[in-house]
Amino acid sequence: MNNTIFDDVFRTMIEKMPYLAVPLINEVFHTSYPQDVPIVQLRNEHQQENGEIITDSCLKIGGKLYHIECQSVDDTTMAIRMIEYDFSIAVENAHKQGRRYRMDFPKSCVLYLRSGNNTPDFLEVEMVLPDENTVLYRIPAIKLEAYTKDSIFEKNLLMLLPFYIMRYEKDIHEMSENSELFQCLLNEYEEIRMNLVIELSGADKTALYMDLNKLIIKIADYICQSEEVVRKGIGEVMGGKVLELESERLRAEGEIRGEAKGEERLSILINRLILDGRSTEIQSVVTNAEIRKQMYKEYGI
């Protein structure tokens, strides 16, 4: 099983859209950071004598360290791996007070994309220190299956949307043969798309809408790769398949210049196309200036 795709998508969101992690941090650690809170991304590579370890994310917000790992399987060694990661992060950020060092462990959690009855709510390691004192290392385990599409939007946990299809992973084959179940799935994704349009309707959020859309399709393509009908259906509902982050490619090609007026105009056009069921035309609109000009005229924008 290719678990790299899940790591890649999660790290892409952390690196290119770190503000999406803020609502998740608020949910897990009961904080109340605003979504525009300053975020410092710390390096994910930590050098140890026996080699390098790589974490999924390490963020500094409000003077505190946060570490989130995305896990696609219920690995029983995860508690030990997490304390190893967190110890490395704490050592790298240790500060000296006279002859004494202080190490602050990050606030950490594991996001389980797949979980079962035996997946714990907390990962724990009991540490016996040299003076025989015992310290309990305990971090929360967050399970994707606990979040419906409604709770995701209610809590603004948009970071979970690309992985939403994994809630139905075991039912994909049955859906491909049962038109009623298949239509229920498509209806869910239609609601997801429309909610995204509402949540990300501002001119400054057009790029985020496109990026999330493509990541949703990327994971759905992978999960449904053996069921062409389901894979294609989700892709059509979400508006087409482009694996490269669309907004980044557009910026590289110079199609989006960043002028506020131009971005707002394009955002309005994209939203109109989505509402009219013309999502398949979005890519040509954002990549072809002539087609975009014609569409502006057609919609009177």
Indicate residue ranges for each PLM-predicted region.
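Accessory alpha/beta interaction modules
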Residues: 1-159, 289-301
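Short, charged alpha-helical interaction segments and adjacent helix-coil junctions
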Residues: 60-72, 172-301
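Short amphipathic alpha-helical signal-transduction/dimerization elements
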Residues: 86, 90-93, 169, 220, ...
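Coupling/switch segment of ABC-type P-loop NTPase heads
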Residues: 153-181
